[in-house]
């Protein structure tokens, strides 16, 4: 929901500009973020929008989304890129807590429809990103799971091989990965330092 929320609340001008160019708003944003360097000129976004807070890689029901590092020199385009980067950093944060190295990630949902964002995921994770043809892939996964349980396929590999078709593969640009890794410690340190702020905020407005 992060891009949608950002567009709904801050994206009026962007939507107008995209309409004037007769462009899809997401295609237009992909063009714009290419004009901003890695690190979004120091703007950092933490994508904890859900009312229940964050569940991985840490659990904190009081965690809330925020932009940090904004000054008068920044523009909406910096904020847009920071939103893209923040979601990808959050995914990296989760994968770095897993016991084995992640060499390939299958991406689905809204982010998978965005070539620029899919490539950003690959560059930030330092892993190959695979997108899949089709829609409602979560529902498809439920159906395939049931099909394996019922014995229509002998295992998940057979089910996937028979029904899933790769749309595109994104290879990581390791030079860009190294640049992103300069900013990743800032992402983690910022949310660590915000935890006491989240706690105080929740107590003040009665969310505890």
Mark where each language-model region is.
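Active-site core segments that coordinate phosphate-bearing ligands/cofactors
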Residues: 1-108, 112-208
């Amino acid at each position: 929901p992060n891009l949608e929320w950002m567009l709904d609340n801050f994206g009026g001008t962007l939507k107008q500009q995209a309409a004037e160019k007769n462009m899809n708003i997401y295609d237009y944003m992909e063009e714009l973020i290419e004009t901003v360097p890695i690190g979004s000129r120091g703007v950092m976004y933490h994508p904890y929008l859900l009312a229940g807070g964050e569940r991985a890689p840490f659990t904190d029901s009081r965690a809330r989304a925020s932009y940090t590092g904004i000054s008068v020199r920044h523009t909406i385009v910096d904020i847009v890129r920071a939103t893209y980067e923040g979601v990808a950093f959050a995914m990296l944060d989760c994968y770095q807590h897993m016991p084995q190295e992640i060499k390939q990630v299958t991406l689905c949902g809204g982010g998978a429809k965005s070539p620029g964002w899919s490539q950003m995921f690959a560059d930030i994770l330092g892993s190959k990103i695979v997108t899949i043809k089709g829609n409602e892939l979560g529902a498809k996964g439920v159906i395939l799971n049931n099909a394996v349980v019922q014995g229509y396929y002998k295992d998940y590999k057979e089910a996937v091989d028979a029904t899933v078709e790769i749309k595109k593969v994104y290879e990581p640009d390791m030079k860009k990965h190294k640049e992103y890794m300069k900013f990743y410690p800032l992402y983690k340190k910022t949310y660590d330092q915000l935890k006491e702020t989240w706690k105080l905020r929740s107590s003040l407005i009665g969310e505890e």
